């Protein structure tokens, strides 16, 4: 079965049970939104240089996500735990790509953010047909979040960004935060697009 044949209807899986486990929500330092092409910012980005505390917190978040997703280096493990490919391979015009989003429908829709349980794990298709884990994506629907919160979500100092509706994914408005924990992004660990991620191999395998 090709990767494209594994793609399923995403919106039917959006409502799942509440997440369990410890939450790692940021309330230590002020929100800092890094430049993220392709998303509407949830708030105006702070252009001042980050403090050492903010840098430490950002590095800590990357480590937490990397440790929490290490087992998903084998995509079969992600599939076994309920993640499934959605949207095909997401690429941008001149800004690189996001890659392949494997979404856990049971973790989406609760309005809860847990740094150790990302709603999405991200892969890049390789020329040999394998998939390489590149990072994770945290996603919460705007309407679910707004029930109990007046401010946009943030995770350990990183402000989520808003995708308004309608959008290319056909979803209601949602907040999202990418964490490139497994493939260094020269534009920053939390930007949406990765200039060194490509959909070329995915496209070649699914022609």
Task: Please report, for each region that a protein language model flagged, where it lies by residue.
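Primary mode marks residue(s) on the alpha4-beta5-alpha5 output face of response regulator receiver
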Residues: 36-207
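N-terminal secretory signal peptides that target proteins for export/translocation
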Residues: 1-12
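Sec/Tat signal peptide C-region and signal peptidase I cleavage site
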Residues: 29-35
């Amino acid at each position: 079965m090709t990767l494209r044949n594994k793609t399923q209807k995403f919106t039917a899986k959006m409502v799942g049970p509440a997440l369990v486990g410890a939450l790692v929500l940021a309330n230590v330092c002020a929100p800092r939104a890094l430049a993220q092409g392709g998303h509407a910012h949830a708030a105006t980005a702070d252009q001042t240089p980050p403090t050492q505390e903010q840098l430490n917190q950002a590095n800590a978040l990357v480590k937490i996500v990397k440790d929490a997703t290490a087992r998903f280096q084998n995509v079969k493990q992600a599939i076994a735990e309920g993640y499934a490919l959605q949207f095909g391979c997401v690429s941008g015009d001149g800004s690189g790509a996001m890659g392949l989003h494997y979404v856990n429908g049971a973790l989406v829709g609760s309005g809860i953010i847990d740094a150790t349980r990302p709603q999405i794990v991200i892969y890049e298709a390789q020329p040999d047909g394998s998939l390489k884990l590149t990072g994770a994506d945290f996603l919460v629907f705007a309407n679910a979040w707004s029930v109990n919160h007046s401010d946009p979500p943030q995770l350990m100092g990183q402000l989520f960004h808003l995708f308004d509706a309608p959008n290319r994914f056909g979803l209601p408005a949602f907040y999202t935060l990418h964490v490139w924990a497994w493939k260094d992004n020269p534009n920053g660990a939390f930007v949406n697009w990765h200039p060194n991620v490509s959909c070329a191999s995915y496209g070649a395998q699914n022609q």
